Amino acid sequence: MTAPKATILSSDEIRRALTRIAHEIIERNKGAENLAIIGVHTRGIPLAERLASKLSELEGVEVPRGMLDITLYRDDLSEVARQPIIRETQVPFDLADRRVILVDDVLYTGRTVRAALDALIDLGRPEGIQLAVLVDRGHRELPIRADYVGKNLPTAKHEVVKVKLQETDGTDIVELFDPEDLQ
């Protein structure tokens, strides 16, 4: 793998973006009462953990957190792998009467979010669902929009946005690549 085309967010910029998103969530929801944070595998989970911790720190209430595997809800499952890896879904609380903040790293076509919404609705009927993403790169194929965005990043369709997080990759950074640079 060669050097990235550009660094989109540094570690400090990721931290600041998540802090801003936490404040926006609190403002829109008039606090953190009745909120729950659910991260989409894989990198949505550590982002959700960080957001939940920040919300708890700012509001003084424990925000329930969960993780969602959308593998079986994807509309491209046959293209992903012959034997898809099924990860764990953990939502150890009742969704009823909660506003759920669904968290993912990158919003692109909207298909991952659509699958996450299907998976979430199968678990219960929350009061509402809001979407928080670290990067929105455009190119939507479905009518889906994030409620909270760390960075809007217009990209070419062929470009690749790579999010690396301390919990999964040992570092916090968001980089932009041309596909041939990832070979």
UniProtKB/Swiss-Prot annotation:
It comes from the Bacteria. A motif (PRPP-binding) lies at residues 100-112. Its EC number is 2.4.2.9. Gene3D superfamilies: 3.40.50.2020. Pfam families: Pribosyltran. Substrate binds at T42, R43, R87, D104, D105, V106, L107, Y108, T109, G110, R111, T112, R137, V161. One of its GO terms (molecular function) is uracil phosphoribosyltransferase activity. It catalyses: UMP + diphosphate = 5-phospho-alpha-D-ribose 1-diphosphate + uracil. Regulates the transcription of the pyrimidine nucleotide (pyr) operon in response to exogenous pyrimidines. This is Bifunctional protein PyrR. It comes from Deinococcus radiodurans (strain ATCC 13939 / DSM 20539 / JCM 16871 / CCUG 27074 / LMG 4051 / NBRC 15346 / NCIMB 9279 / VKM B-1422 / R1).
